[in-house]
Amino acid sequence: MVRGLYGGAHQRLEMQIQKRVVGPVVVLDVSGRLVLSDPGSDAQFKDCVAELLESGTESVIVNVANVTDIDTSGLSALVSAHISMARTSKRLKLIAPTPRMRHLLHVSRLDAVFDVCATEEEALAGFGST
């Protein structure tokens, strides 16, 4: 347990990735922390995307609604995944970023790089998979 700023206790959630398939699209539900201080979280994410590429997955949605914290290492992992997908003419979309993540994407100008959607339905429609 970690004490919060206001004395409340909360747990530090390590990153977890749940994979599910919606038609031809793989959805990665990412939760917890995607930060450098959590050893291996960025590598775990990169490995997951590499496995999808090796398996021939064409379209990936990364649901970041439950990412509780992200830093430059986490952003770097997302950028690396995007680049890996784009190099092989595959597509990656982010859905449901928190207000803080939206702000980080904006100030780093990554909002111009990623296709960011509010909902899974919107992202699937963009892939033509509704």
Question: Which residues fall in each region the model found?
Answer:
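Non-catalytic signal-transmission and effector/linker regions of two-component phosphorelay proteins
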Residues: 1-21, 128-130
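STAS-typified acidic loop motif
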Residues: 13-47
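General small-molecule cofactor/ligand-binding pocket signal
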Residues: 18-20, 95, 117
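Residues that form or immediately flank small-molecule/cofactor binding pockets and catalytic motifs
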Residues: 22-24, 99, 121
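Short secondary-structure transition/capping segments
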Residues: 106-107, 125-130
